UniProtKB/Swiss-Prot annotation:
Family: Belongs to the CTP synthase family.
Enzyme class: ligase
Boundaries of every Glutamine amidotransferase type-1 domain copy: 290-543
Gene transcribed to yield this protein: pyrG
Keyword annotations from UniProtKB, A to Z: ATP-binding, Glutamine amidotransferase, Ligase, Magnesium, Metal-binding, Nucleotide-binding, Pyrimidine biosynthesis
Remarks, miscellaneous: CTPSs have evolved a hybrid strategy for distinguishing between UTP and CTP. The overlapping regions of the product feedback inhibitory and substrate sites recognize a common feature in both compounds, the triphosphate moiety. To differentiate isosteric substrate and product pyrimidine rings, an additional pocket far from the expected kinase/ligase catalytic site, specifically recognizes the cytosine and ribose portions of the product inhibitor.
Binding positions (Mg(2+)): 71, 139
Amino-acid positions noted as binding ATP in the UniProt annotation, renumbered to this chain: 14-19, 71
Highest taxon in the source lineage: Bacteria
Assigned EC number: 6.3.4.2
Single annotated GO MF: identical protein binding
Pathway: Pyrimidine metabolism; CTP biosynthesis via de novo pathway; CTP from UDP: step 2/2
Protein name listed in UniProt: CTP synthase
Length: 564
């Protein structure tokens, strides 16, 4: 039977419950325990698919096509278990399910209430999400005291009563603010947070105390006394400069041992060799590159969380320090491409909406003309096709019908039909609801032999995750290929363009993909596409300034001649 670790948060949000849960899961996994993680989100949205990235951050896509919370990305990066749609659910999904049951008459005419119907549904969703795991870590979104979180907290309280004593463990993540005028960490917010948790019937077994400095022994004893938590279970969770140090930090304070003891699990000792090697590689780079990430959500970098992590993973495996420069594409529209001058590579990620599109196209044109390594992801591939069509094919005003429905050259259009991971035919139109209606999840991509993409992956076919509605218009593919663009990846049916590239005789590294490779990158293995991209950036950075300038001037001359 699965045992449960419930992770809650107090005082403020964004303390890092997801990282804490993932780090504990990583420790348990190194001890030979089968572990999974669930994220319970209290918001009423059915999923985050249509939420503003500035409010929610990144939408992480699972292999089975679920649009989920970004914490699931952390889970997959820290442990080997792949997440599914059952690893993340929201208040919206719970109420939707309960209302469907009420309409069917499942409650036999009874009055449907938060207790027991909503709480029972939450418990059912939790049990359905654990699969065959020995331990399921369940992260409750929000903070203790939020009205939205109360049904979830009540549900896990009930589970702790209904299950055997050693089958549940409660971990509470809280904040210890440092007051500089007093010169000390203040424990009162933590005391009140735990008091509120205990008032609803939950006694935490472990406290993770977030702070910017180590927790002094006296404060540790004080917290233990006032919260009814054993002193050794009050753990200092200090700020670190990279998240991959956290498993070792928690292991040093015996968090995994405390949890195993609480759950009555006998397991082998933790082996952190892999994590220590990752941290060592991060802290001892042999190279350094600057990457321009040109997007529209750059004011909230969590909008590109998996992408920034994938670049860091590639840096680990190429012994390279990655400096990511987040550049607002609207600034390029207003002030030009001068901000790209000292970059060693350019990346245009996915996105939605017309705002900032022309700035991204300008960045792509700069990368192509100056032979700077370029990686386009999702929208970044679509805009590369638009840029190439306008400037190489001379198709003036070529565009995507997403941004210009009346474009004379619709080089990208809405997908109307495709097959999902189960082989079912999906059909969409411009009038279809936005939520959950994209081409989502893992899709097979066939790689053409003798292309850079095939060389990078070393395989004939790969499975990568998608999240988009628009695709390259097949009518324009012959013109694109005739002008020198290589269509290096196709969908399993061979009718959708998945990858494009320029020949290396023309450009050293210009690759773009319709899918999101960042969703499958892990610190342990990296991702072949990102590793190759960083290698290309290292090579470009290694050129002398004179060589770079000559390369750029020659390419500009060639481009000007071809335009004439």
């Amino acid at each position: 039977m699965t045992k449960f670790v419930f992770v809650t948060g107090g005082v403020v949000s964004s303390l890092g419950k997801g990282i804490a849960a993932a780090s504990l899961a990583a420790l348990l996994e190194t001890r030979g325990i089968r572990v999974t993680i669930l994220k319970l989100d209290p918001y009423i949205n059915v999923d985050p698919g249509t939420m503003n990235p500035f409010q929610h951050g990144e939408v992480f896509v699972t292999d089975d096509g679920a649009e989920t919370d970004l914490d699931l990305g952390h889970y997959e990066r820290f442990i080997s278990t792949k997440m599914t749609r059952q690893n993340n659910f929201t208040t919206g999904q719970i109420y939707e399910s309960v209302i469907r049951k009420e309409r069917r008459g499942d409650y036999l005419g009874g009055t449907v209430q938060v207790i027991p119907h909503i709480t029972d549904e939450i418990k059912l969703f939790i049990r359905n999400g654990v699969s065959d795991a020995q331990v399921a870590i369940v992260e409750i979104g929000g903070t203790v005291g939020d009205i939205e979180s109360l049904p979830f907290l009540e549900a896990i309280r009930q589970m702790s009563v209904q299950l055997p004593h050693h089958d549940t463990c409660f971990i509470h993540l809280t904040l210890l603010p440092y007051i500089s005028s007093a010169g000390e960490l203040k424990t009162k917010p933590t005391q009140h947070s735990v008091k509120e948790l205990r008032e609803i019937g939950i006694q935490p077994d472990v406290l993770l105390c977030r702070s910017d400095r180590p927790l002094p022994l006296e404060e540790r004893r004080k917290i233990a006394l006032f919260t009814n938590v054993r002193e050794e279970s009050v753990i200092s969770a200090i700020d670190v400069d990279n998240i991959y140090k956290i498993p070792a930090l928690l292991h040093e304070q015996m968090l995994d041992e405390i949890v195993c003891h609480r759950l009555d699990i006998l397991a082998r000792p933790a082996n952190l060799t892999v994590w220590k090697k990752l941290v060592h590689a991060l802290e001892h780079p042999e190279h350094e590159v600057s990457i321009a990430l040109v997007g529209k959500y750059v004011d909230l970098t969590e909008s590109y969380k998996s992408l920034s992590e994938a670049l860091i993973h590639a840096g680990i495996h190429t012994r390279c320090k990655i400096n990511i420069h987040y550049i607002d594409s609207e600034n390029i529209e207003q002030h030009g491409t001068g901000c790209l001058t000292n970059m060693d590579a350019i990346l245009v990620p996915g996105g939605f909406g017309k705002r900032g599109v022309e700035g991204k196209i300008m960045a792509i044109s700069y990368a192509r003309n100056h032979r700077i390594p370029y990686l386009g992801i999702c929208l970044g591939m679509q805009l590369a096709v638009i840029e190439f069509s306008r400037n190489r094919l001379q198709l003036e005003n070529a565009h995507s019908t997403e941004f210009d429905p009346d474009t004379p050259y619709p080089v990208l259009g809405l997908i109307t039909e495709w097959r999902d991971r189960c082989g079912r035919v999906e059909k969409r139109s411009a009038q279809t609801d936005l939520g959950g209606t994209m081409r989502l999840g893992g899709q097979e991509c066939l790689l053409k032999p003798h292309t850079l993409a095939h060389k990078i992956y070393g395989a004939d076919k790969v499975i990568e995750r998608h999240r988009h509605r628009y695709e390259v218009n097949a009518e324009f593919i012959p013109q694109l290929e005739q002008a020198g663009m290589h269509i290096s990846g196709l969908s399993a049916e061979g009718d959708l363009c998945e990858m494009i590239e320029l020949p290396q005789s023309e450009h050293p590294w210009f690759v773009a993909c319709q899918f999101h490779p960042e969703f499958t990158s892990t610190p342990r293995n990296g991702h072949p596409l990102f590793k190759s991209y960083i290698q290309a950036a290292i090579s470009f950075a290694g050129q002398s300034d004179r060589t770079k300038l000559h390369s750029r001037n020659v390419q500009e001359s060639v481009t000007t001649d071809s335009s004439n």
